[in-house]
Amino acid sequence: MSKITFLGGGSFGSALAVLLAEKNNVVNIYDRDKNVVNEINIKKTNEKYMKDFAIPKGVTAFNSIEEAIDGADYIVLSVPSHVIRSMCIAIKGKIPRDIPIISIAKGIEEDTDKRLSVVIEEELDNPVVVLSGPSHAEEVVMRIPTTIVSTSKEMKFAADVQDLFMTPYFRVYTNDDIIGVEVGGAVKNVIALAAGVIDGLGYGDNTKAALLTRGMKEISRVGIALGGRAETFYGLTGMGDLIVTCTSMHSRNRRAGLLIGKGMSLEDALKEVGMVVEGVKACRAFYQLKERIGISMPITDGLYKGLFEGKNAKSIVDELMNRDKKSELF
């Protein structure tokens, strides 16, 4: 039995907290929202992030970070990507250095273009494990068979986290390509936003297939440029996560894109979704990154112009379709 603290009471963190509690672990959740904390502790629900599902008795919520992390064997950073650094700063010097930090966010730091594990390493001296893959919280909590990947620079810790989370319905693989795993999980959010836009525009299966396939090319292109391995992008954290995020009704990124494709402004679409849409910040970050390192990411480029420069979505699709001819494998 282990004690695991989740810093953030969002949907995926809550789903994993339920999973670990059902394995007879002691689970703490820190959340800054007192209403969320009280609801978890009193009603044993978290309706804001996980509707219609009960929280096991083994889960306790706290408003105090210090209380939540006290005695923890593992700490899970279950906050959005833009909060990762500030959360690490909040626990710096308050935990032993041998406690693994598990990152479940999918994105990069917008202002620095740094992967989230790098951000964590800059602030903390603890081992870092990244847990990523095609895993919507709504399905995990329903015990629908799910597969995911655990990765770290120190594979002993990746294997420990594999054992920690493995259940008959939640299968965890290990992969030593932490760069590829993180980049795949971040860029697929950009492609998922674009997938939602083309759905909102009313395009069909042919268009969606083209977007996913060429989106996969963008993921692998930037991932390899940053040091990831090609085969990683055709695994769970690349192709697998891309498929589920671009096609699922659960995907916040696809839903936001769908609303934008139907004519809603970015601001209004984000309000309608009501939760963090990582693809928006990732789009800006990867647009800046591809400009800096000099690689071609036409889907990301087009989405950026639509989101931040007000360009018409249909005209962006027309431009993509009328680019200079070239080999598919370029």
Swiss-Prot record:
It is found in: Cytoplasm. Gene3D superfamilies: N-(1-d-carboxylethyl)-l-norvaline Dehydrogenase, domain 2, NAD(P)-binding Rossmann-like Domain. NADPH binds at residues 11-12, 32, 106, 137, 252, 276, 278. It catalyses: sn-glycerol 3-phosphate + NAD(+) = dihydroxyacetone phosphate + NADH + H(+); sn-glycerol 3-phosphate + NADP(+) = dihydroxyacetone phosphate + NADPH + H(+). InterPro entries: 6-PGluconate_DH-like_C_sf, 6PGD_dom2, G3P_DH_NAD-dep, G3P_DH_NAD-dep_C, G3P_DH_NAD-dep_N, NAD(P)-bd_dom_sf. Sn-glycerol 3-phosphate binds at residues 106, 133, 135, 188, 241, 251-253. Keywords: Cytoplasm, Lipid biosynthesis, Lipid metabolism, NAD, NADP, Nucleotide-binding, Oxidoreductase, Phospholipid biosynthesis, Phospholipid metabolism. One of its GO terms (cellular component) is cytosol. Pathway: Membrane lipid metabolism; glycerophospholipid metabolism. It is an enzyme of class 1 (oxidoreductase). One of its GO terms (molecular function) is NAD binding. Its EC number is 1.1.1.94. HAMAP family: NAD_Glyc3P_dehydrog. Catalyzes the reduction of the glycolytic intermediate dihydroxyacetone phosphate (DHAP) to sn-glycerol 3-phosphate (G3P), the key precursor for phospholipid synthesis. This is Glycerol-3-phosphate dehydrogenase [NAD(P)+]. The lineage of its organism: Bacteria, Bacillati, Bacillota, Clostridia, Eubacteriales. The gene is gpsA.
